């Protein structure tokens, strides 16, 4: 059974926040399970989210819920373990809608992930995400 691997000890970073308004649009809203809140990036050609986990994990799925009109046509998941450089795990191709989308991930043992959103549907390159979930297992 795959579980959400993002926990309070997971350190997250984002490429940008709309108008630097972290209270209303900050990264914490990616993981709060609240349908009313979201991370809203500022404009730019490529937006990203990094996650540093407190232990090694084995990723099996990535779930993302965009706001339609502010999604990405292509995404890339990269990961690393320890001090290794990030390497590509998988490319994924979201649809431009409001649904929670699930992307299978080839088994990868990592403690750091980077999700990059490219080719955004918004003319200015903004991305709006209500939920970001990393599913899999914690390594013992």
Curated annotation (Swiss-Prot):
Cellular compartments annotated: Nucleus
Keywords of the record: Nucleus
InterPro entries in UniProt: Galactose-bd-like_sf
Keyword set includes Endoplasmic reticulum: no
Cellular component GO terms held in the UniProt record: nucleoplasm
Gene3D superfamilies: Galactose-binding domain-like
Summary of subunit composition and partner proteins: Interacts with NR2C2/TR4.
Family per record: Belongs to the NR2C2AP family.
Job of this protein: May act as a repressor of NR2C2-mediated transactivation by suppressing the binding between NR2C2/TR4 and the TR4-response element in target genes.
Protein's UniProt name: Nuclear receptor 2C2-associated protein
